[in-house]
Regions:
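Short glycine-rich hinge loops at helix-strand junctions in the catalytic core
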Residues: 49, 66, 89
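Terminal substrate-recognition subdomain of acyl/acetyltransferases
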Residues: 87, 102-126
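Acetyl-CoA-dependent GNAT
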Residues: 1-46, 55-57, 61, 65, ...
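Conserved catalytic-core motifs of GNAT/GCN5-like acyltransferases
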Residues: 73-75, 86-108
Length: 126
């Protein structure tokens, strides 16, 4: 059986240098959902809209298949990541996981979802 998990390196087109990786699960937790396990970009490329471009191109690719949604989880204490995911269209909270009470060594994640057909191309440049 083909694995649902894929780890993809992210490279700059012109330089072919690795700037990060993308960790995805096809059809998890449901057949019509693509789960983004991780997206990591090197700090040297922050602020150049590579994250937005990666998500936009990923959506273009997965629209060719039967996916309707993408999901990811984000730590509640990670404000830059929450802002990023909201900006690229992960605006629906579909769940949460983690510790039940707050503390320094405690964690909690929001599970966010995007309807991949809800965003228009022109919205990506806002």
């Amino acid at each position: 059986k083909k694995s649902l998990h894929r780890l993809q390196t992210i490279r700059l087109k012109n330089e072919n240098s690795v700037i990060g990786y993308l960790d995805i699960y096809h059809g998890w937790p449901k057949k019509n959902i693509l789960w983004l396990g991780d997206i990591f970009l090197h700090s040297k490329v922050y602020g150049h809209n590579y994250g937005r471009e990666i998500i936009y191109n990923l959506i273009k690719e997965i629209k060719k298949f039967e996916y309707k949604y993408m999901r990811c989880s984000v730590r509640l204490k990670n404000w830059p990541a929450i802002r990023f995911w909201a900006r690229v269209g992960f605006s629906k909270v579909v769940g949460y996981l983690g510790d039940k009470d707050y503390g320094v060594n405690k964690f909690a994640d929001l599970i966010l979802e995007m309807d991949i057909n809800a965003r228009r191309k022109e919205e990506w440049m806002e």
